[in-house]
A protein has these predicted regions:
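Catalytic donor-sugar/metal-binding loop of nucleotide-sugar-dependent glycosyltransferases
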Residues: 134, 146-161
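Acidic donor-binding/catalytic loop of UDP-sugar-dependent glycosyltransferases
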Residues: 32-36, 41-58
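Conserved donor NDP-sugar-binding/catalytic core segment of glycosyltransferases
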Residues: 49-88
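A recurrent flexible, glycine/aromatic-enriched loop bordering the glycosyltransferase active site
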Residues: 99-119
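Terminal low-complexity segments of carbohydrate-biosynthetic enzymes
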Residues: 179-182
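Active-site-proximal specificity loops/subdomain of glycosyltransferases
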Residues: 1-35
Length: 182
């Protein structure tokens, strides 16, 4: 359990939360001298049963610094309004179109940068100075620092299912995009 109190409100947000957790994971890996894998995940996301084994199998013996993990937002159900499901379809289509356009143009660093679906080796995390404390976009900036190391990859053998929920806590990102579209 990690207990963090007296946090400066200027820095509290998803970036700060990820940083606290990832820094603690790094500390624990350093304590046992192990270059472990640090996974990022959102509390309201779900995953396939093979999530951990798929990540471990891809990153364990390879020289990969990190990976973007395949994701699909839910598009049907009773947990959210139909408009939220409709808007997440549009938003995710935009994300996939953007990444595919980068690939089509030959951009060598065309990866999804979704915070709930990324993993990084502890050594790469330390080498790049850890996670930033941004209130939004922390995943984008962090993943691009890891990609710059080279040997970044995708894991398409499992799926993260992030929530399509709205959010007014961040200036941009999935939750804000869904909220603004309603």
């Amino acid at each position: 359990c990690i207990y963090a109190n007296d946090l400066n409100p200027k820095f509290t947000g998803v970036g700060c939360a990820r940083k606290i957790g990832m820094d603690e994971a790094l500390r624990r890996f350093l304590h046992v001298n192990y270059d472990g894998i640090i996974c990022c995940f959102d509390a309201d996301s779900i995953v396939q049963k093979n999530y951990l084994t798929a990540i471990y199998n891809k990153l364990k013996s390879n020289s990969y610094a990190g990976a973007s993990i395949y994701f699909e937002h839910p598009i049907l159900g009773n947990s959210f309004k139909s408009a939220e499901y409709e808007n997440i379809i549009l938003y995710e289509t935009h994300l996939r179109y953007y990444k595919n356009a980068l690939e089509f143009c030959g951009f060598p660093f065309a990866f999804h940068t979704v915070g709930s679906s990324m993993a990084v080796k502890a050594s790469a995390y330390a080498k790049q100075g850890g996670m930033n404390r941004r209130k939004a976009g922390e995943d984008f900036y962090f993943i691009n620092k890891i990609i710059a190391l080279g040997n970044y990859t995708e894991i398409n053998t499992t799926t993260v299912i992030p929530s399509p929920r709205t959010s007014d806590r961040v200036p941009f990102g999935t939750g804000r995009a869904i909220l603004d579209a309603l």
